[in-house]
Amino acid sequence: YRKIRNTARFILGNLDGFDPNTDCVADDQLQEIDRWALAALDDLIVSTNAGYAVYDFNKVYHAVYNFCVVAMSNFYLDVTKDRLYCTNGVARQAAQTAMYKILVALDKIIAPILCFTSQEIWDFLPKTEGMNKYVVFEDMPKAGQYAADEAFKAKWAQLIAVRDEVKKVLEQARAEKTIGASLEAAVTLYCNDAVYDLLNSIPMDELADLMIVSHVELVKGEGGSASAVEGLGVAAAHAVGEKCERCWKYSDTIGSHSAHPTLCARCASVVEA
């Protein structure tokens, strides 16, 4: 219960000031990881609707719990923190748009089994026209709206597998005192052609956010520590540059803005905007 509540609370906190009537972005402005999160939501809708249809509330609870812990807290919400905390504009609104859609659907799903909690969440959710005052009067979400094709799901299963291998190498680097927090790291990924094409399909800044490191470099060929992903080697070193006091990433652009000597160029531009 606490995991479900905390997931909702985190999302609500990051929707402060978000107006779904004016701030939602179009689907083509969502980042791929936002689309992945919505696809995971669609899978949850399929599973919970099937559970409710046969009164299998245990199945519903476990599906919701796994979604909140594995898909949201341990992955999506963790990866999107940099966008939410450190940027303005479309990138941040894209994450908020996905999170808003996720929480609206999730709250409807839990309403039959967590009545008071779901209404408490609903009271704090920003509303659009036509939404009921009470969540129990809302229709259950229908599957298909956020469904992704199998190729997209397979791609992201591979990306998550790569991320898991990077995390292993970062843990080793942490044990060797090479780095402390993961944002102190710069990661080099040695790839065969297939893995290179997979990773290169994601913008490098988004790939770094996915790994929660300051820098990612792709290299064709062999190198680094062997991994469970075929055609992938991983190496980690301490990132060059200094730590930005705002985003905590390491960058060689620290101090490039005279008015903000402790910020990276990105954060300085956001603060000045």
Regions found by a protein language model. Give the residues of each.
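Short linker/helix segments within small regulatory modules
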Residues: T253-T262
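Short helix-adjacent coil turns
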Residues: T48, Y52-K59
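Short metal-coordination and nucleic-acid-contact micro-motifs, chiefly zinc-binding Cys/His arrays
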Residues: V240-K243, H260
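Residue-level signal for inorganic ion chemistry
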Residues: I4, M72, C115, L170, ...
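Acidic, turn-prone loop/beta-hairpin segments
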Residues: F18-N49, L77-V169, A173-D197, V216-A235, ...
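Core structural elements
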Residues: R2-L12, E32-D43, H62-R83
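Short cysteine-rich clusters marking metal-coordination/redox-active sites
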Residues: C244, C264-C267
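Cys/His-rich metal-chelating microdomains
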Residues: Y250-T253, V270
